[in-house]
Regions:
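Start-transfer (signal-anchor) and selected internal transmembrane alpha helices
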Residues: 1-32, 55-115, 540-548, 553
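Loop-to-helix entry region of an early transmembrane alpha helix in multi-pass inner-membrane enzymes
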Residues: 60-62, 150-154, 165-186
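Transmembrane-helix motifs of polytopic, lipid-linked glycan transferases
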Residues: 74, 178-199, 237
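Transmembrane-helix signature of polytopic, membrane-embedded enzymes
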Residues: 101-106, 191-214, 232-233
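Extracytoplasmic catalytic/substrate-binding loops of multi-pass membrane glycan-assembly enzymes
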Residues: 122-134, 143-159, 163-171, 524
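Membrane-interface anchor segments at the N-terminal boundary of transmembrane helices
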Residues: 171-175, 416-499
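Membrane-interface alpha helices of multi-pass inner-membrane proteins
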Residues: 258-273, 284-285, 303-310
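Membrane-proximal stem/loop segments at transmembrane-domain junctions that anchor or position
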Residues: 322-447
Length: 562
């Protein structure tokens, strides 16, 4: 009873936390309110403005926002009260227990065991449209291009060569499937093993291992043969490395081993997806800024040289090799807003209307414009590709002019263009997973999936393991925001750096996505879920010495973390 009274009297004194708690709760409530205004009458990504549009604000919409605010604020408050009592659950009492390498293999085997029904049903995995393009490049039916990262294409080529040696492309793709499954299981196992070495309790390790094994988005992404799985895995390793830096308070940043690991991970993240370069630049800058007082000149110089080398290879060298073939580019979000204004007959001058008409016939725009998918416009003959890529400056000026005249239309267009990345209530099947073969794959390469369970037993379990409920990408970004909030509550401010690569990934997608729903773009947010529950409790190495004392003492003893 006395404990219950203490809980009721609890009052947080962290003003920054309280302020951000109100801000994040309000952001969530606003997304719920804005979602309630969207009338969506189609489950297809090609939905037109007849199928998806904004309605007028009603009392019901306002109440949805208010109720959402109250519910989220209440939940956060309950967690806020309970979270201070959870250190005993998160950490082992015996921190001097010797660390055994066989724990890694136990975790690895457990994850693979849970994945086995998926592996035996969908082996070797599903080839996506982008991967199909990479295969076409590998067999010389398309020219090599870094639009789909060339490193990923060359990785596929290595395995196709293995298939050539055996006179069977099926063997090559099977080998690639096994490789990706093994690497993904190993990376996830390494994360749990890393927590084990940080003295997290066996209970926490078991929960995370079970999550990796049971949650469908892990085995299905291990079986999704597209660039996003390896990219997110190397990005996840990069994040674990950032966490290692944080737990050592940046004292390892000048170590030769750390410099090599950090540089290699920067290179891998940059080359496995094109937005990775911006992610590592932003993250590295902040890491350097936070730990600059540690005299990390070696780290700064090494990171700078690595960034310059990456730029030199991806820029001038790739251009010389003919891998950067596009003579120009456009921002899908920007063009989508301009076309939305045109398709909805927004406010514009006759001159602006003519300019848009040159970009793409306005009458045709009204027929083919889809606010959720920009790529439905680009194939039509009326889309003037040459004009758009050579008139970037003029288009940007037009974008600003129309923004001033049509702010509401711009907000609506942007909201629909990025719908799946901010709206927790919306999820489509498009680019959610790729465990099935893309249509036409067998026309270019003789490979197929084998359902071994059906082959051996005469019955398939596809209906049992197929995705039945899809989760919005926005759920996972809000999990990160909530986790950051509790990290701030516990005053572990440097731990916030660990979230940055995932947030920057989401941010780059929000700036330039051509499609409103694509879990693969931000799959790193899913990989981050166990981290979200760990980071608020992650301590610096020097604090480990105090854990045993803290956990061993009575409840009335308090330990200062910072």
């Amino acid at each position: 009873m006395e404990k219950f009274k203490k809980i009721l009297k609890y009052k947080c004194k962290n003003k920054l936390y309280i302020f951000l708690k109100y801000i994040i709760t309000t952001i969530f409530a606003l997304t719920a309110f804005w979602d309630s205004l969207i009338n969506l009458n189609s489950d297809k990504i090609q939905a037109t403005l007849k199928d998806i549009y904004f309605t007028n604000i009603t009392f019901k919409n306002i109440m949805i926002g208010i109720i959402s605010w109250i519910i989220v604020f209440t939940i956060l408050t309950i967690i806020e009260i309970l979270i201070s009592k959870l250190d005993n659950i998160y950490y082992k009492k015996n921190i001097n227990e010797p660390k055994k390498k066989r724990v890694f293999f136990l975790i690895f085997g457990t994850i693979l065991l849970f994945w086995m029904p998926y592996i035996l049903t969908y082996f070797p995995g599903g080839i996506f449209a982008d991967t199909k393009a990479s295969i076409l490049q590998c067999i010389h039916l398309m020219e090599y291009d870094n639009a789909n990262p060339i490193v990923y294409t060359l990785l596929i080529k290595v395995f196709l060569k293995i298939g050539d040696l055996c006179n069977s492309p099926q063997i090559g793709i099977n080998a690639f499937g096994l490789f990706q499954i093994t690497i993904m299981a190993a990376v996830l196992s390494y994360f749990v093993y890393w927590l084990y070495k940080k003295n997290f309790s066996y209970f926490i390790l078991a929960i995370i291992t079970l999550f990796f094994g049971i949650f469908k988005l892990f085995p299905l992404y291990a079986l999704s043969i597209w660039k996003d799985t390896p990219f997110c895995l190397v990005l996840f390793l990069y994040i674990i490395n950032i966490a290692e830096i944080v737990t050592k308070n940046g004292k390892n940043l000048n170590d030769i081993k750390e410099l090599i690991i950090y540089s290699l991970l920067m290179i891998a993240v940059s080359f496995f997806r094109n937005n990775g370069f911006y992610i590592i630049i932003a993250t590295t800058f902040i890491v350097f800024a936070v730990y600059r007082k540690n005299k990390i000149l070696k780290f700064g110089i090494t990171a700078l040289i690595t960034i310059i080398l990456i730029y030199a290879v991806k820029g001038p060298l790739f251009t010389t090799l003919g891998l950067n073939k596009s003579s120009g580019s456009w921002n899908s979000v920007m063009l989508n807003q301009i076309f939305y204004v045109s398709a909805t007959d927004g406010n514009m001058t006759e001159e602006e209307s003519e300019f848009i008409n040159t970009m793409c016939d306005r009458n045709k725009l009204k027929e083919v414009y889809t606010p959720l998918l920009f790529d439905t416009i680009t194939p039509v003959p009326e889309f003037n590709y040459g004009f758009i890529v050579t008139h970037n400056t003029e288009i940007k000026k037009l974008w600003v002019k129309l923004l001033i005249k049509n702010p509401k239309a711009y907000l609506e267009a942007y909201s629909l263009n990025t719908l799946g990345f901010w709206d927790t209530n919306k999820a489509f099947k498009d680019a959610y997973t790729s465990h099935l073969m893309w249509k036409g794959t067998q026309d270019i390469i003789d490979v197929e999936q084998t359902d071994y369970i059906e082959k051996w037993t005469g019955k398939s379990i596809k209906n049992n393991i197929e995705v039945k409920r899809r989760y919005s990408s926005a759920i996972f970004i809000f999990l990160i925001l909530f986790s950051m909030l509790f990290t701030i509550q516990k005053k572990r401010y440097k731990n916030l750096i660990i979230y940055l690569p995932a947030i920057f990934t989401w941010g780059t997608i929000m700036l330039a996505t051509p499609i409103a729903f694509s879990m693969r773009y931000v799959y790193i947010l899913v990989l981050m879920v166990p981290f979200d529950f760990v980071i608020p409790f992650l301590k610096e190495k020097e604090q480990d010495k105090q854990i045993k004392l803290t956990l061993g003492e009575g409840e009335n003893k308090k330990w200062k973390y910072w």
